[in-house]
Amino acid sequence: MSKQSNKLLHIATIGKSVGLGGDMKLHIKSDFPEQFKKGVSFFINENETLTLSDINHERALIKFVGYNSPEDAKKLTNKNLYTTIERTRKECRLEKDEYFWFDIEGCSVVEDGKVLGIVDELDRMGITNYLCVITDETLVKSGFAKSFLIPFREPFTINTDIKEKIITVIGAMDILEAS
């Protein structure tokens, strides 16, 4: 198993206790709510897991095995739920031209054959996803910003090649120059 597939992905945060049966509010941070199913376990740290005993997607409520009272449930308030990259690839289905963010991170951003930088992370602002790019060192030495944002959509993104870890863009140099 590769080092990357051992990485835990933050997919939700447990909210406040609701009612008398140990139910809790669920704040999903993922585009894949279908991964929250009865009987599925999630990490709360590298060594501890919680297993869902019930979920109500309409009300965004969850309940965990062994947490049957408000007092028990309150111990979990504000805990993050994590899953693995391996499980995400197995359980979550992508449409054509959709990518997991962890596959985008680390890609080179290239315009007109020139590497502008490396994708450090993605950030969602409103309905648009942005590539947070760490600028190539040679460009930084030439006076450009150390990092910049590129909208991850047309017309800026021409091609995304996950296997080669290259995202071909247009207009990103203009964005970098204005940063």
Curated annotation (Swiss-Prot):
InterPro entries: PRC_barrel-like_sf (IPR011033), PRC_RimM (IPR056792), RimM (IPR011961), RimM_N (IPR002676), RimM_N_sf (IPR036976), Transl_B-barrel_sf (IPR009000). Gene3D superfamilies: PRC-barrel domain, RimM. Keywords: Chaperone, Cytoplasm, Ribosome biogenesis, rRNA processing. One of its GO terms (biological process) is rRNA processing. The keyword rRNA processing applies. Pfam families: PRC_RimM, RimM. One of its GO terms (molecular function) is ribosome binding. Residues 96-175 form the PRC barrel domain. It comes from the Bacteria. An accessory protein needed during the final step in the assembly of 30S ribosomal subunit, possibly for assembly of the head region. Essential for efficient processing of 16S rRNA. May be needed both before and after RbfA during the maturation of 16S rRNA. It has affinity for free ribosomal 30S subunits but not for 70S ribosomes. One of its GO terms (cellular component) is cytoplasm. It is found in: Cytoplasm. It comes from Sulfurimonas denitrificans (strain ATCC 33889 / DSM 1251) (Thiomicrospira denitrificans (strain ATCC 33889 / DSM 1251)). PANTHER family: RIBOSOME MATURATION FACTOR RIMM (PTHR33692:SF1). The keyword Translocase does not apply. This is Ribosome maturation factor RimM. Binds ribosomal protein uS19. The PRC barrel domain binds ribosomal protein uS19. Belongs to the RimM family. Coiled coil: none annotated.
